Regions:
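Second-shell loop/turn segments in exported
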Residues: 32-40, 53-65, 124-128, 139, ...
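Short amphipathic alpha-helical interface segments
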Residues: 622-626, 654-685
């Protein structure tokens, strides 16, 4: 009897397991994903970080004469794992300074070494300083110009307790005759300065001769402030020595060769450096450690026949952030022309629960609709579901469907989030070259850019799960073939329908928020804009997937009917939103205006075409602040072409910060002012047309753009 019950229980469990497998779907087969799960190693990825940056070290000047230790290590491991075409490339960029000695002392009322650059490299803000100087310490509070008024700082060190802005404090101090500045370097004045009082955030100050700037933790700054408040005379000694060294963009390139059936290629990687003095285990090296493991696992699975050999050559890039990617693409235009997508891994390895974090994928912006987003999202959500214990499957045991953990890692939940675009990493640069790219990142990161960004914050389980997602997504993009391309297009279509539904939900919420008839009619316009905008984006996504097919030139013939079907989805959702409009019109005692006429302001905006006064680029107008230039042009963190910075230019009228990167791109597309307004309102939230016009007028005044009246349509000749 017991044996029969046992066999029956196994049968039930088998049925349940089958149901789980049917529910959990992604773009690769269950067998392929299971092979990836079994091979990808979070422990190896963590070992890579321990090889690359086991601690934050002071780089010896001799490294600038050859290759950096991180480059040599990752190149050696790539060769060991079977990557091909492994090379370290250098692009000289002039001269820079490397600190070799840095000691900050209190000499009275007692001798105390406060910081040593070899203990905390971030403590030396003035990385070019060469001086042995001593002076009394004086408190200048927040370090504003008013704080310096009437204060004699000549020959002294100043102490600032402002949470940031050490460079400005130093400049004011030295201008007033001070020999140096000590100030807090933290991420804002909020919880982080309280929760992490010993943390120093990386900052750089260019020092004048015989002066120095030191970055303090919030705790150390308060200790010094307390001593001064007690009336104690505090004397500071700063000892600094730095050497001028040849600067360069250094990167490591490696490949997994395609099968030769296509000239197309793909890219994946992270930044090995973000400057050569600042280092970090998560924000610098985790993406490189992860993608090195992704490549190792992929190569082994190909060799074992568990994954097909890629049709497209895979380029692994481990670079100086942004500028290194740009240097490589400029040096290899043949590669830039054939890469069809990039997976950028920026900060990947935190134990999520320690940092209140999610593992996030930042989508491409709506100005760059792409197939690539849904590949990453499908893989992330698949792994997240597998690792989640689902109560409806408890008959199979109180456990996740698949245990995706590392031997020495956590057993935490896998918190993932698909988020709107943000820039400030290498995916921005790829998009500036016309290559779709997404970024994966753990955020928030309580230790990034700081003295506490060290390997002890990392989790080998997080590495393993991220490696499974990354390997799966890479295999989809690299493998090719019409069958897999069709899977991606189908995924794009279905997820696109969901996103149009989200746009409808935004629109109907605008209607529900309306408290007057006038507001309701305006909300109906906004609702229509939101739904229509998302539909246009999704048509672009479908079209973009054509590059994955064996014959991309013939793909539009197959994809056009699918794109056209999206218009019917938009029409249906607009019609159902119209019913909600009627509901709220009755509530407010007004009649719906199904086709609202344009206001005089909208007519004027529709008639004004935005043109660049200079060169129009992929990223916007070349002269536009924050536009970042075009293909191969210069630019920094958060530049256009998918940048994440303000992009607002000089002081004056400005849109909300999160809209400005897209605005910069839209300026170069020869759209009307109304089309720009509708695009921003559709992608984000309704923005007043008057605000958009004020920003455009301000840009016109600065000479960045010109507003040109739309040419009148040709007169229709009357029939005789």
């Amino acid at each position: 009897m017991r044996k029969a019950l046992f066999i029956a229980a196994i049968a039930v469990a088998g049925i349940t397991a089958g149901a789980q497998e049917k529910e959990d779907r992604t773009l690769l087969s269950h067998e392929q994903m299971n092979a990836i799960i079994n091979e990808a190693s979070g422990e190896r990825a963590l070992h890579h970080v321990l090889e690359l940056v086991p601690y934050q070290f002071v780089r010896p000047p001799s490294e600038y004469q050859g290759h950096f230790r991180e480059s040599e290590k990752i190149a050696a491991l790539a060769k060991e794992y079977g990557f091909t075409n492994v090379v370290i490339e250098d692009f000289p960029t002039g001269q820079t300074w490397q600190p070799v000695v840095g000691e900050l002392w209190i000499t009275s009322p007692r001798a105390e070494k406060v910081y040593d650059v070899h203990d905390i490299p971030e403590s030396v803000a003035s990385t070019n300083a060469n001086a042995d100087i001593t002076g009394d310490l004086i408190n200048v509070g927040q370090g504003t110009a008013q704080d310096f008024d009437g204060t004699d700082v000549k020959g002294k060190f100043v102490l600032s307790t402002a949470p940031s802005g050490l460079g400005a404090v130093y400049a004011r101090a030295v201008a007033a005759g001070a020999i140096g500045a000590l100030g807090i370097s933290a991420i804002g004045a909020g919880d982080r300065a309280v929760d992490y009082p010993d943390q120093i955030v990386s900052t750089t100050v260019s020092a004048q001769p015989n002066t120095a700037a030191w970055a303090l933790s919030p705790k150390k700054a308060r200790q010094l402030e307390t001593m001064l408040n007690r009336g104690q005379k505090v004397t500071i000694r700063s000892v600094n020595k730095s050497e001028q060294v040849p600067n360069k963009q250094e990167l490591v390139h490696a490949e997994i060769a395609g099968d030769g059936s296509t000239t197309q290629e793909v890219a994946i990687g992270g930044h090995l450096f973000e400057g050569y003095i600042k280092q970090g285990a998560n924000d610098d090296n985790s993406g490189c450690a992860l993608t090195l493991e992704v490549g190792r696992a992929y190569i082994k699975l190909i060799q074992e026949g568990k994954l097909p050999r890629p049709k497209r050559t895979v380029n692994f890039q481990w670079v100086q952030e942004i500028s290194g990617t740009r240097a490589w693409l400029d040096a290899h235009p043949d590669k830039a022309k054939v890469i069809i997508g990039d997976l950028n891994f920026d900060m990947e390895a935190l134990r999520l629960t320690m940092s209140r974090s999610y593992w996030i994928m930042q989508r491409t912006p709506d100005t760059f609709p792409s197939f690539i987003n849904d590949i990453g999202q499908s893989m992330m959500e698949y792994v997240s579901e597998l690792t989640r214990e689902r109560v409806r499957y408890r008959a199979n045991g109180y456990q996740p469907v698949v245990n995706i953990t590392a031997p020495n890692g956590s057993n935490d939940a896998f918190y993932v989030k698909i988020d709107q675009h943000y820039g400030s990493s290498d995916h921005v640069t790829y998009m500036q070259y016309g290559i779709p790219a997404v970024m994966f990142i753990t955020w928030p990161d309580m230790w990034y850019h700081s003295s506490q960004d060290t390997p002890d914050k990392q989790d080998s389980t997080q590495y393993k799960r991220a490696a499974v997602v990354a390997t799966g997504a890479l295999a989809v993009i690299a493998s090719g073939g019409d069958e897999l391309a069709g899977r991606v297009t189908s995924e794009n279509l279905s997820r696109g329908s969901e996103r149009i539904g989200v746009a409808q939900r935004k629109g109907t919420s605008y209607l529900a928020d309306a408290a007057s008839a006038e507001a309701l009619h305006a909300a109906w316009k906004d609702a229509r804009v939101a739904i229509r905008h998302q539909g246009n984006v999704e048509k672009g996504v479908i079209t973009s997937s054509g590059v994955l097919y064996g014959n991309p030139a013939a793909a539009p013939k197959q994809l056009d009917p699918i794109a056209a079907s999206i218009d019917r989805t938009v029409a249906a959702l607009t019609e159902s939103a119209r019913a909600a409009y009627a509901l709220h019109a009755a509530r407010l005692g007004t009649q719906p205006i199904d086709e609202p006429p344009q206001t005089p302001e909208e007519k004027e905006a529709a008639n004004l075409i935005v043109e660049c006064t200079g060169r129009a680029t992929f990223s916007g107008c070349a002269a536009a602040a924050g536009a970042g230039g075009g293909r191969g042009a210069g630019g920094g963190r958060g530049a256009g072409g998918g940048g994440g910075g303000r992009g607002a230019g000089a002081a004056g009228p400005a849109l909300p910060q999160h809209m400005n990167a897209e605005l910069s791109i839209l300026l170069g597309k020869k759209l009307s002012a109304l089309e720009i307004h509708d695009f921003l309102s559709g992608e984000f939230e309704p923005v007043p047309l008057a605000d958009v016009m004020a920003v455009l007028r301000a840009r016109e005044t600065t000479g960045t753009i010109k507003l040109v009246s739309r040419p009148a349509p040709p007169a229709v000749k009357k029939k005789k």
